[in-house]
Structures are given as structure tokens and as C-alpha cells.
A protein has these predicted regions:
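Membrane-embedded beta-strand positions of outer-membrane beta-barrel proteins
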Residues: 75, 171-173, 202
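Flexible, surface-exposed loop regions and adjacent strand-edge segments
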Residues: 1-4, 90-99, 184-194
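Conserved small-residue
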Residues: 1-54
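Outer-membrane beta-barrel "beta-signal"
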Residues: 150, 154, 194-206
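Repeated loop/turn-to-beta-strand initiation elements of outer-membrane beta-barrel proteins
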Residues: 70-75, 159-162, 198
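Residues that define the transmembrane beta-barrel architecture of outer-membrane proteins
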Residues: 56-60, 143-148, 194-198
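Extracytoplasmic gating/loop element in the C-terminal half of outer-membrane beta-barrel translocons
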Residues: 25, 80-169, 175
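Outer-membrane beta-barrel pore domains and translocons
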Residues: 67, 78-80, 174-178, 205
Length: 206
């Protein structure tokens, strides 16, 4: 990922990278835009400028709860809109991957191969030597809506429980991270293992 930089007057969560002029369909080379606006084929880290900000414009939580005739549904939802991220999955695991190892299929299927190709990724040749290049091609808008937890429960009618000696009986099933909708496609669980889990519970009262 690009190094964290701090400049007077800029956000502390600003993303700094060299602006990309895109991939030349004729040669497969990436062009860059220098600080002064000139175009070049030579990458220079001194040309890094602010190309995004990780702080979202809008961020929050939605906690809806519905109930009907003993049934209840609880959701915990998070949303964020208006920020940007540097997509490390695309930068490291697709474009700059070591071709001698197992790779994402996009590294082969969506790369530049011949004249007039207009792909999202550079030629895989010498890919593992480009890891220190940070360009705006990998900065993406981060608009995300995710359901963190969902719980469905049912509480039995107390009148029906008297015959078995219960005053109350509630059963529930829950799941974490069941749904995620995002403008960004990236690998999850690289810094901390990602997993989905189910929880089933029975809560009797005698």
C-alpha cells in the first residue's frame, strides 16, 4: 500500500499516489501524470498527489427490529459512502503477482497481451518487479452496505407451554456477516481471518 503521508492542509487519511494516464493500447505501458501536469512513461514517487480519502462522507449503522406473533427479526447493518480505498488485492494479488506462483485468473485473462488491447492490467511480464509502484488506477470509491449480524427468533405462547412445565421458551438462530454489497471487490481476511458463523440458542424459563 502507499506510504502514509502528511501534508499541511490535507486530510490525515488522504491517499497519495501518482496519477495514472492509463495503459497505452499500442505498447501496453502505463503512462503517468507528473505534479506539473506533464505526461511521462517514467514512474517517479515524487509525483505523488492526493488521489482520494479513506474517510467516508457518510457512515453509520442501521439496527432494525421487526416482530410479529411471536416471531422477531433483528439486523445489525453498517454503511459507508463517499470515501476511497487503495485496492491492494488488485495491485498486489492481480497485477503485481509473481507469475511463477498460483495467481488470480484476472492476471492472465484481463492483462495487456497485444496491440489495441484495452485491459485493466499491465502485461504479466516482470509483474513481480513493480510492487513499489503506486498509481491512481487502484484507487476505488468505497460505497459499502453490509449486514453484520442477523437473528431470527420465536417465542412460544405461554399457554401452550404449561403442559410441559415451562413459563417461557424462546429459540433463535443467528449468523454473522451474511451479506455484503460493495463497489469494491477485494480479498477479505488478509490481516485477520475472516469467517462466517452460526449460533443456535434455546432459552427456557421454568
Amino acid at each position: 500500500a502507499p506510504k502514509v503521508l502528511y501534508q499541511e492542509g490535507e486530510s490525515e487519511t488522504a491517499i497519495y499516489a501518482v496519477r495514472s494516464a492509463g495503459i497505452n493500447p499500442a505498447t501496453g505501458e502505463e503512462g503517468f501524470i507528473k505534479k506539473n501536469g506533464a505526461y511521462t512513461l517514467v514512474y517517479d514517487s515524487n509525483d505523488k498527489v492526493v488521489v482520494g480519502d479513506e474517510t467516508p462522507v457518510l457512515e453509520g449503522a442501521i439496527l432494525p427490529m421487526l416482530s410479529y406473533k411471536g416471531w422477531s427479526l433483528n439486523l445489525s447493518m453498517m454503511y459507508r459512502f463517499g470515501g476511497q480505498v487503495y485496492n491492494l488485492t488488485r495491485a498486489i494479488n492481480v497485477e503485481n503477482v509473481n507469475p511463477r506462483h498460483n495467481v488470480d485468473r484476472r492476471a492472465f485473462d484481463e492483462r495487456w497481451k497485444k496491440v489495441n488491447d484495452i485491459p485493466p492490467y499491465l502485461d504479466i511480464a516482470n509483474a513481480d518487479s513493480r510492487t513499489s509502484i503506486h498509481t491512481s488506477r487502484f484507487v476505488e470509491d468505497d460505497n459499502t452496505l453490509e449486514v453484520k449480524t442477523i437473528t431470527v427468533a420465536y417465542e412460544f405462547n405461554p399457554e401452550l407451554l404449561k403442559s410441559i412445565g415451562f413459563k417461557r421458551l424462546r429459540v433463535s438462530v443467528g449468523m454473522n456477516d451474511p451479506f455484503r454489497l460493495s463497489t469494491i471487490k477485494y480479498e477479505r481476511g488478509t490481516s485477520y481471518p475472516f469467517s462466517r458463523g452460526f449460533v443456535f440458542s434455546i432459552s427456557p424459563t421454568f
